[in-house]
Every structure is written in structure tokens, then in C-alpha cells.
Amino acid sequence: MMGRQGGDQSQLFYLFNLERRIPADHLLRRVNPIVTRVLADLREKLAPFYSDIGRPSIDPELMIRMLIVGYCYGIRSERRLCEEVELHLAYRWFCRLDLDDQVPDHSTFSVNRHGRFRDSDILRHVFEAVVRACMDAGLIKGEGFAVDASVIEADASRYHGKAPDEIDWSAPERQTRAVAEFLSSFEDEGPDTDRKLPKVISPVDPCSAWTAKANKRVQFGYGLNYLIDTGHAVIIDVEATPARTYDEVAATRTMIDRTEKTFGLKPKRLTADTAYGTGKVLAWLLGKNITPYIPVWEWYERTDGMFPRAAFTYDAECNVYICPNGHPLRTSGTVHDGRVRNYLSQPGDCRACELKARCTRAPFRKIARDINEEARDYARSLTGTPEFERSSNERKKVEMRFAHLKVQHRFERMRLRGLCGARDEFHLAAIVQNLKTLANRLWRPPPNMVVAYSA
């Protein structure tokens, strides 16, 4: 017999307990005790940025909790986030809002983001508090780290890129926070800076980089840099950069130094991909007693049939290269481009050499040697060892972090503009990912757990 839902008249009174409506295994319930501990000193941290008089503001803890909800469930639009918190019981419970409590207006987030939150660097503070909670839970071993970067598309059209000299920065439509941040970065460096403007720049988000790294499609983007502990893939540090390989590699040193200063953690080994295998980075790591399990960024091999660079033997005692016919290539000691010394053969030796046709078309042969070639040689010696293979497998953990962020959290494109906006979004993403890792490791179902949805 077909049933019918009865009762057109709603009840006048309900006995309702919001606490009992949230399942025991709900993500927000598992995360809640961690967030409560992490945000314990939030008001104290933000107190200097609020006035002692005037109307009470929106509770900053409420805004942080709402942002955590948004990044947990891929709701990065603050307007939509406010609508979802208004309707969703679990979101209300996590944000400590009763059924009759009013949800803050979406504009509140913009005002605080560009003011108190950035001035106090509160998102960085929350991120570091979550990392310390992971350390207290024993999830961070501090023995091996992995580093990598992923491109996140900027909120800028890839069809509207222009040369810098084509843009009038004084135009009214260019008076935005992102443009002001970009111009002030040059003012801070001074007139003698060696920094050059890129060939293509976005008029609306000039801090982003013109890149073809992601999906081989040219676009404007930012580099999301993660430094993780390979034990449980906890994100130890995060850094926002333009999506350029040079900036991403430089961020590695920033994150490792900051991690050592903030948490007292220095890894014994670091794993990364070939982009980080430059002589400069390898030498820096060895100088800090960190073993680099990183493939070396090798010189391009010749494809014209001439003798490759490997055919020349380096004599460390005499500081010369020996060609296949036994002649030396010497250097003047001059460092070119801040990284290499050139070793040149004698034109007379080359003229009389029967192997010249297979060696060079020039009057002499030149071999470039990195000033940190010893560090490169050491990194090469690690290739193929069991430790190297194990570290290479652990590198997948940081790549999985990026995949999880883009697929599960739908974080494929920026919503905010400017490097500060990217920094805010990346810190929130890392906070949520670490919270989920910690909650999954710590949570244990209560005995005879029964998920009750009735009051």
C-alpha cells in the first residue's frame, strides 16, 4: 500500500539538540577538539589589532572556523560559505552558532583579511599551531623531508597578458590591491635592484607568473610550495611564489631555514625532483649537513655526433680536463654567470688533432664546470642506492598532497589576487590538510558507536 506523508501543519514547538544531530564520526566533530586547542590563544594574538572602545566586532574565532569549513569542503567563495553555514547544521555546530544565531556578512571576511588578519599574520600563526599539534601527537619524525611545488592558476585571463611597457599603471582601473602590492615590491628593493620585469605580465594580477608548466598550457599562475615530513606527510611549511622554477627552488631554502628556526627541526635528508638538483642547492644542503636524495640537473647532451661532455676526464689534482686524445683543457679561474668556470683547449692542439672533426667545429673545445661540481658529484654517487630509491618513493607523498588538494578540495584556481592573497589561500589549504591528517590519526570510534540522527 502506498504511503502518504501526512501533516500539513508544522509543529509549534520542537525539542531540538544541535549537539545530538552531528554524527560521532563526522569530519568536523573529529577536527573540532584540535581546532579548539589550536585557537586557544587567538584572541590574545589579535587583541592589539582591536580597539578598546566601540561596538563589539564579529568574533575572530568564528571567522577562522568558517574559513576552515570552507576549505574543508571546497567552498572558497565567502558569499556562498555564509549561505551554506546558514543552512547546514554541522557547519553551524562547528562554528558554535545556535539555530537562531546570525551568520556574519560575507564582507566581514574581506575587511578583516586586508586588515587585522594580514597585519597580525594570524593565518601563519594558526598554521604553526597546527604543526605543533602534529608534533605533540608524534606525527612528525623530523628525519626526512620532501619538497615540491605545484602551479595554481591565477585569477587572471591568459588571453590578456601584455608587455610591461604597454600597461599604464596610473590608470584608474589599475588602482587595485594586487597592483599596489606589485609596485610596492619594486619600491622596497630600491632603484639599484637587479630584478627584471617579465616579458609578459597580467594587468590585473602582475605578481603572478606567465607559465606553461601546468598541463602544458600557457597561463598566469602561482607556485604552491610544500615542505612535508615524509613520515605521515604532514606539511611542515608552505610558501607562495610566482610560478617560476627559480622562485620555487629559492623557496626551499626559505622553508628549511624557517622550519629550523620556528620548530627546531632540521632533516637528515631531503628528497625532491630534478628541478632542485642544481649545484647551488646541492652545495647549500650539504653545507647544512642534509643529505640530498635529488636527481642532478645535468647539462644537455650533444646530439650532433660530437664527443659528449662525459668523454672528457677531470683531473682534480691539476684542475684540468683531459680530452679523448690526451690534451688538457685549462681554466683562467673566472666565474661566469655566477656559477661556472670554462675550461678551454689550446687551438694549436686542436689543429693538429686527428679527432677534431668529432670534437668541435670551433678553433678550440670548451667545457663548462659548475663551481659546485663536487656537490653534484656527491649527489650523483647517491643515485641508485637503496636509500635513494626509498626517498624517491617518499617523494610521491608530497605529490599526493597536491592531487588531494586539487581533486578533493577543488583548489585549482586562485580566488584572491596578489602574492599576499596567494599566501592566505595556501596557508588555509595547508591548515585544513594537516587538520584532516591529525584528526584521522587521533580519532577513535567510541565503543558501540551508534550514529543517532533523532533528537
Where are these regions (language model features)?
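Short, flexible loop/hinge motifs at secondary-structure junctions
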Residues: M1-L15, E166
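Anion-binding and metal-coordination hotspots
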Residues: R4-Q5, G74-L87, L97-A455
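Basic, short loop/linker segments at the boundary and entry of helix-turn-helix/winged-helix-like folds
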Residues: A24-I68, Y73
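Amphipathic alpha-helical interaction surfaces
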Residues: V69-C72, L87, Y91
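Short arginine-rich
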Residues: R92-R96
